[in-house]
Design a protein with these regions (language model features):
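Anion-binding and metal-coordination hotspots
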Residues: 3-421
């Protein structure tokens, strides 16, 4: 089954958030009828959704970017384009740019890329000329062309041929444009799957005495991590008045911050495994990891397994700008320690620890212990059933092959497919 609907109608649906409203109405009707008796325990998992675009290489992206911009100008500013277009552009961009029509030799492909780059710069120079109408710059196809050229080429220099960026100077996947036909469809990789498109998180009830009703569909860019989706999902469930007591999630979702915030803000217990301590001691299963140190939070002191106290307690931020505490021990004491090799691999520096804020640290350490118990594992095993819902969406409704052209339309289509499920 594939959902099709006319463009203007689709626009009205998007503006009104119709897919969420319909799902909310359905859930409350099910509740009123007695079919939905409880939503105490729910589970969520994400899957990839392909964008409705061809996979383009760099040369195709450049050519298509130029073609889209020219096609847009031909519709909204035909007179202006007629006076600024170059004769060669009709041959180069008159039809879809496809790899089988492009040169095969690397030298010829590089030369064509430079030619397309020069064409794009000439068009942008004309559009940004003071005498050109300023509204031309707001045309989506033109802005997409500008962004692609910034990402693919170095800044132009006078009397120097336009130069492609090297791979190391290319933008990260979070902003890289892979097709001018959908600038929000980004490349992402998860486990063994690589795709260009989006991500959808489906939440369903998994209480033993309740049917498996889907309660929420949350669509994100493909580059948004699962852990970043936890708070928006809980916020949406709160708006629906469908918050669970327990939320079963796989290892991609739980973090110390999510464990704490979910409990304090929504009174939800996340049932999901947290990542193990990344230290070499934990990986080698020998030596002293952070769990072997005693922390005195009130006095801001840490005691090592040998009974020595830390000398520095510094507040800071990690690479994600999240608050952490950096603890350091005395250099002389550490260098003379008889079990130094079990504590640090540094030949001269003392042992250092990076701790999370107290509440998060305790929540993380507690979960690492409880997730080893048979009782916890038995509860968590119920999370696996969400994959059958994904299978239904894939095989029966074709979620991964919906015609998705923009992020909001992705959300709309995924929401309606959820209702059909």
């Amino acid at each position: 089954m594939t959902i099709q609907y006319e463009s203007e109608f689709r626009t009205r649906l998007l503006a009104g958030g119709a897919e969420q409203k319909l799902l909310d109405i359905l859930l409350h009707r099910l509740k009123e009828s007695g079919l939905l008796k409880t939503h105490r325990r729910q589970r969520t998992d994400s899957t990839h959704v392909l964008g409705a675009i061809r996979t383009l290489n760099r040369l195709e992206t450049l050519g298509e970017g130029m073609r889209v911009a020219l096609d847009s100008l031909a519709v909204v500013a035909p007179d202006w384009l007629a006076t600024n277009i170059q004769p060669d552009w009709f041959d180069r961009y008159g039809r879809r740019v496809e790899n089988y029509r492009l040169p095969k030799l690397d030298s010829e492909r590089e030369a064509l890329g430079s030619t397309i780059g020069a064409d794009g710069l000439a068009l942008l120079d004309a559009i940004y000329d003071p005498t050109a109408p300023q509204w031309l710059r707001q045309i989506p196809g033109v802005e997409t062309l500008r962004q692609i050229w910034v990402q693919q080429f170095y800044a132009p220099e006078p009397d120097v041929q336009v130069k492609w960026r090297t791979v190391k100077d290319m933008p990260p996947s979070t902003i890289a444009i892979h097709s001018p036909h959908d600038v929000e469809a980004h490349y992402s990789s998860k486990r063994s799957i690589d795709w260009v498109g989006y991500k959808v998180h489906m939440t369903e009830i998994c209480d033993e005495d309740s049917p498996r009703f889907i309660t929420n569909v949350h669509t994100t860019l493909s580059t948004i991590t699962d852990e970043q989706a936890v708070e928006p999902i809980h916020s949406r469930l709160e708006e629906k008045d469908f918050l669970p007591d327990e939320h079963l999630l796989d290892a991609g979702y739980p973090t110390a911050e999510n464990l704490v915030n979910s409990k304090t803000q929504y009174n939800i217990e996340i049932i999901g495994p947290v990542r193990s301590d990344p230290s070499w001691q934990t990986k080698a299963q020998q030596g002293f990891d952070s769990s072997n140190f005693q922390i005195d939070w009130d006095n801001e002191k840490v005691t090592c397994p040998q009974g020595h106290q830390s000398t520095k307690w510094l507040l800071g931020l990690d690479v994600s700008e999240k608050p952490v505490i950096r603890v350091r021990f005395n250099g002389v004491t550490c260098r003379n320690c008889p079990v130094r090799s079990s504590c640090t691999k540094s030949k001269t520096e003392p042992r250092e620890l990076t701790l999370l804020p107290q509440v998060q640290h305790i929540a993380l350490q507690t979960r690492r212990q409880t997730q080893k118990t048979p009782e916890w594992k038995a509860t968590y095993n119920q999370r696996a059933g969400i994959e059958s819902t994904h299978s239904l969406m894939f095989t029966a409704l074709g979620t991964t092959s919906i015609s998705l052209h923009r992020f909001k339309e992705n959300s709309l289509d995924a929401g309606f497919h959820c209702l059909c499920a």
